[in-house]
Each structure stands twice: as structure tokens, then as C-alpha cells.
């Protein structure tokens, strides 16, 4: 049965979608069966994996209770399928408000495909609205990307409070998989200060893997490819493989315990 991991941060530009796409692809390269769910109306994860024409999307999954299997498409990355997003997903925030059990729509929809995959990765919307609450209610854990730049911790308290509320009301089993430092530049004092600050504030919650600023990483989505397909020898590809290995190791330890 798949472990479901949300990738969330309501602050834009922190490497959220980059992480969702490339962690999914790295796990696929490591021969895990992966379903990526694009739950961001901007649909950058979908276009970043070469998805262009779609009939069903996350919107249909949530708003019209479409069967999950109907919404799944193959991607350019080995062992990675996707439920793509569409701008229509914006409307779901409003349309679901009066629905009974509205926070549980994604959890219910994914039950039918959990046995088909090893991991389900959800690229959450850059907000703390109903779609993100759905993702966190469906998830077993959440990865929070944090950029190594000014105001790195801005908004993190709000996200952690949202996670606590979801744990309290909807999903008591939700864990924080880890905080992931992104856009790191070893030449900059600020980057190194952020690494120290995050590690001191959140000991034992931070991934050892740090994602560096990397030109190839930012180029890959415009070609509809993950960094693993676009340039497997780049620093970005190597670091996302390391992150995937770290996630697998953490989960193997959890299973043993």
C-alpha cells in the first residue's frame, strides 16, 4: 500500500513543485511505483512532466468524484504516473465549501489506487485553502521545502499551525516527513546562516540532503522533463536521488520499528 507524501508550503518560489516532480522521478529511477498528484491550479508539475492534453484532472477527482484511475496518465519519467491539474481546480475551492465531508474528498478518491503504487506524492497548492487541507488530510506525511534566502521562515509558523489543526481534526496520523532546504548557495553567508537557523530551530526535522541552486534544475521543466531525464549527471539530479534515498531509508526504519 502506498505511502502518501504531501509537498507543501504556501509561500511561493521555494522549490515546492520542483521537489514534488523530482522526488517522484528519483523514486521512480530507484524502481518504486509512483503516482504524482498535481493539486496546484497552476499545473506546473503537469507541464514539467510533459503532460499537455488531458480529459480528467484533480478537479474532476475532487469536484465530480471521478474514479482516480480515469484521471491517471503516464509521464516521461520511468515508473511515474500523474493525476494532472487544470486551472479549473481554482473553482473547486468554492464549489466544495457546502459539500459534506469536503476535507476528505481526496482521501476517499485515492483509496482505490493505493495498492497500485509504493508512493503517492502530492504537489500542494501554494495556499492553505480547502485543496491543501484535502491533501494534508489524505497524506501520511508532509515535506516542507524552505528556501535558503531572506525571510526563509516566513509563513512556516502558519503552515505548522495548519498541520496541527489537520492532525487535531481530520488526520491524527499526519507526520512531518522533514524540512527540505532548497536554493542553497554555499558561497553566500546568508545561505549558510539559514541552514544553521533552521537546524537550530527544528533539530532532527531537517533532511541531511540540501538542494543547491542549479541552472539545469530550473531549465528542465521548460522541456517537459524531470532533472533526472534532462541531465542525470547534474548536481540537481544527484541531490534529488540523495533525497529519495533518504526518504526510503527513513521509511524502512519506520517499518522496522
Model regions: which residues?
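P-loop NTP-binding core
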Residues: 1-257
